[in-house]
């Protein structure tokens, strides 16, 4: 099975080459970039991957790359690499969600451990993304009327109350409610509520 995709962004070709050899030997798919802008143009918005990002580069700092990733909706976990221990930069990077901040020279075990943590995070993110996409696809099956009924069921209204709210008979509400449960592939109101809670969870 593919171990995961690691993107490496560093303006030093010798550093890139050394990291690429190490990572390929460990079974990872590797893409290297000396230009942050080239990485940002190529970075995927989905899939399981992480990025090793040099802190200090001439065209754009690693922190600026991280900010741009957030703005562009690139949720890939970031591991920062720095030639020196910059405490303020490390603190900012971690606040913005970096997995780790490593100071060169970096030991192989330390780096591979950070990459495993980053790819575990990426795998969890991808599972949530796929799950959310599946829920959104099911929701698209509902008619506007069924969606109205669904929203009121989630709010805890009884069939009679829903009928009064929407101007329909209780029997018609039951029909719509049954269609909602079938199309959303749930078998209880509790499961329906959980489905929407998962959809609204931004994590």
Predicted regions and their residues:
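Conserved acidic segment of CheY-like receiver
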Residues: 2-15, 19-23, 36, 51, ...
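Acidic catalytic/metal-coordinating carboxylates
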Residues: 34-35, 61-64
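Short amphipathic alpha-helix used as the core "switch/output" element in two-component signaling
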Residues: 41, 63-76, 92
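Active-site residues of response regulator receiver
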Residues: 54, 82
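Receiver (REC) domain active-site loop signature in two-component systems and cognate sites
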Residues: 57
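C-terminal output helix
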Residues: 86-88, 102, 106-115
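Basic, Lys/Arg-enriched C-terminal extension of HTH/homeodomain DNA-binding domains
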Residues: 181-203
